[in-house]
Amino acid sequence: MCIRDRPVIDKLAVDMYSKALDKVVEEGGNIIVEGGILDGEGYESGCYVKPAIAEAKPDFHIVQEETFAPILYLLKYSGPVANAIEIQNNVTQGLSSAIMTNNLKEAEKFLSAAGSDCGIANVNIGTSGAEIGGAFGGEKDTGGGRESGSDAWKIYMRRQTNTINYTDDLPLAQGIKFDL
């Protein structure tokens, strides 16, 4: 067992993970990094799955759902960064978001009030959805909000947790690597 291997919550989540990957292909997408269910010693529960990367389109039904599984959907856009922001904001969820760009103006727009409408917005680094010390709780249909604790007054303002990676490296959450 690898230290990065973590189980999904239960067998129902494993089934949802498998169905999500099937749905990507059914809708015309491509699986770039194949996932799958891990088995053998240390994986007896049947709840361990491999991360997957899928190329999809913004109008795919599966992209509009929150799958709670280690699946990264790659969505292409063209034109100004506002087009990418529109694609990203056009879902009902709003926990976390990220953009990869070398353009500082694009990065700043993504992090501005005209940009990502998620609770966490990162530039040039992925997101785990639970950055330590950040404004946790999500936006839109994600999470239960932040009003149950010391963040009660903050409901009256729009907050984001932002990260900009200025290096040439692209570190992934929890040290995950995809050797392609």
PLM feature segments, named:
Residues 5-6, 44:
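Low-complexity basic/metal-binding stretches
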